[in-house]
């Protein structure tokens, strides 16, 4: 059934409240069910930072865009209504369209006739004026076409001239550059000969001005480069072994005098800095600055910025590349600068061990309680509901576990229950952290596994078993 409805009544229902136009991608707010264009409501939320419905002002929370839902019903209504309107226009369309086409053609013809008449009057001013109603279109069109052909012909004749002039200018530029004479470079052989002559002659030897200014500019620079090579005249070769230095040995007795061997070379040479050599005395000791590294003899060494070596004749040590500085003795004993700052290690280690033990004792303990199937088979106890138990205080004794089982199983006293670990009874006064240590120590090596992050912890829970206390265990506990 088709019904006719006024468009004025329908359009407000299909219009967006923000832009007052028909819906484009109709979207509905899920909280209040008001419909808008998708672009309009998104701009409202994003650009204007509005967190409420523009119509009813309902708060949409922190993320209002998540409350938007595309509404297909409004889109279908819009398509149905506007299709009917378009079909009604198409039915009445051919007549109106033909009339509009004819009117447009008439307008175009009138405009072209006016343009032709105006151009004709301006081109021939001496000709008498013609009445406005008379219009001759074909000859004017031919004249315009001829005029265009002549203009194109003139343009085609002018183009090669312009290009020829441009090419001529481009070709003339490199000729000016080529006309300049290039400076001749001096040959390289005389420079090499001159360098050999400089090496053989003294430094104050002057050059004649007739040889050219280029040699006077180049030679001093190369001579300066050669200076450090010739100035490094050192009596000792770098690859040679350094002089042997014997350090005075300290005797075990403090009262006896030190036995010092004769020193072959009593000077320490610093090759790079060329410092003044220092004589080694009996009251001085060679030490290196690498305090963390100790020599094989146990004494520490101190570097002085260069690389030298030391070797002892008695022990036959290999030379070590070090430089040495002198440090005075105080009362014939070497003073350790770091001795005053060190603290006794024993008290610190004991405190750390106590802290570690306290932290271990404060850790919670996980275990499981299961009924024993090997002990006291005649009177088996039922299982409890809890599969795993966690105790925060690891200093708790086993007697609390017996009380827990007494409550869960409904027994008269805790003495009726016996707790087992690996087929061995557990004493009631034993603490839980000691029980965990016992469980770890008694675990055989093949059964021990390394824990992985994210894996199941069921295999790392201590299993405890409970049963009725038998007479044998009572007699055993009484004898103890």
UniProtKB/Swiss-Prot annotation:
Residues 298-309 have a biased composition (Polar residues). Pathway: Protein modification; protein ubiquitination. Residues 246-260 have a biased composition (Acidic residues). Disulfide bonds: none annotated. Residues 113-133 have a biased composition (Low complexity). Residues 175-193 have a biased composition (Basic and acidic residues). Keywords: Metal-binding, Transferase, Ubl conjugation pathway, Zinc, Zinc-finger. Gene3D superfamilies: Phosphatidylinositol 3-kinase Catalytic Subunit, Chain A, domain 1 (3.10.20.90), Zinc/RING finger domain, C3HC4 (zinc finger) (3.30.40.10). It is an enzyme of class 2 (transferase). Its EC number is 2.3.2.27. A zinc finger (RING-type) spans 16-57. Residues 93-133, 167-193, 241-261, 280-356 are annotated as: Disordered. One of its GO terms (molecular function) is zinc ion binding. GO terms for biological process: protein ubiquitination. Residues 103-112 have a biased composition (Basic residues). It catalyses: S-ubiquitinyl-[E2 ubiquitin-conjugating enzyme]-L-cysteine + [acceptor protein]-L-lysine = [E2 ubiquitin-conjugating enzyme]-L-cysteine + N(6)-ubiquitinyl-[acceptor protein]-L-lysine. It comes from the Eukaryota. This is Probable E3 ubiquitin protein ligase DRIPH.
């Amino acid at each position: 059934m088709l019904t006719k409805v006024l468009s004025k009544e329908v359009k407000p229902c299909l219009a967006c409240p923000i832009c007052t136009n028909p819906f484009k991608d109709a979207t509905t707010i899920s909280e209040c069910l008001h419909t808008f264009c998708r672009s309009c409501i998104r701009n409202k939320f994003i650009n204007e930072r509005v967190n409420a419905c523009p119509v009813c002002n309902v708060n949409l929370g922190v993320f209002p865009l998540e409350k938007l839902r595309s509404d297909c019903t409004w889109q279908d209504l819009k398509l149905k209504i506007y299709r009917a309107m378009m079909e009604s226009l198409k039915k009445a369309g051919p007549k109106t369209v033909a009339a509009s086409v004819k009117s447009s053609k008439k307008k175009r013809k009138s405009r072209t006739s006016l343009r032709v008449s105006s151009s004709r009057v301006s081109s021939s001013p001496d000709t008498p004026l013609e009445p406005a109603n008379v219009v001759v279109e074909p000859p004017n069109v031919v004249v315009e076409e001829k005029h265009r052909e002549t203009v194109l012909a003139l343009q085609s004749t002018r183009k090669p001239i312009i290009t020829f002039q441009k090419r001529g200018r481009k070709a003339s530029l490199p000729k000016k550059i080529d006309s300049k004479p290039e400076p001749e470079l001096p040959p390289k052989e005389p420079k090499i000969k001159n360098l050999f002559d400089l090496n053989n002659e003294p430094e104050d030897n002057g050059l004649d001005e007739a040889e050219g200014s280029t040699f006077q500019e180049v030679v001093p620079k190369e001579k300066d480069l050669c200076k450090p090579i010739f100035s490094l005249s050192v009596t000792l070769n770098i690859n040679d072994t350094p002089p042997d230095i014997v350090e005075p040995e300290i005797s075990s007795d403090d009262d006896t005098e030190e036995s010092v061997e004769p020193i072959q070379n009593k000077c320490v040479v610093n090759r790079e800095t060329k410092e003044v050599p220092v004589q080694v005395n009996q009251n001085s000791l060679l030490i290196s600055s690498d305090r963390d590294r100790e020599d094989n003899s146990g004494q520490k060494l101190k570097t002085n910025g260069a690389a030298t070596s030391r070797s002892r004749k008695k022990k036959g040590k290999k030379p070590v590349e070090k430089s040495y500085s002198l440090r005075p003795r105080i009362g014939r004993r070497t003073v350790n600068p770091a001795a005053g700052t060190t603290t006794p290690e024993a008290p610190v280690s004991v405190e750390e061990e106590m802290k570690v033990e306290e932290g271990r004792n404060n850790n919670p303990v996980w275990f499981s309680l299961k009924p024993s199937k090997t002990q006291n088979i005649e009177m088996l106890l039922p299982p409890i509901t809890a599969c795993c138990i966690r105790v925060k205080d690891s200093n708790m004794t086993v007697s609390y576990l017996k009380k827990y089982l007494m409550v869960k199983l409904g027994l008269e006293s805790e003495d009726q229950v016996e707790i087992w670990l690996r087929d061995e009874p557990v004493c009631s006064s034993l603490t839980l952290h000691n029980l965990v240590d016992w469980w770890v120590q008694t675990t055989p090596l093949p059964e021990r596994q390394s824990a992985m992050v994210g894996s199941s912890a069921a295999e790392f829970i201590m299993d405890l078993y409970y049963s009725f206390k038998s007479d044998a265990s009572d007699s055993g506990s009484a004898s103890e």
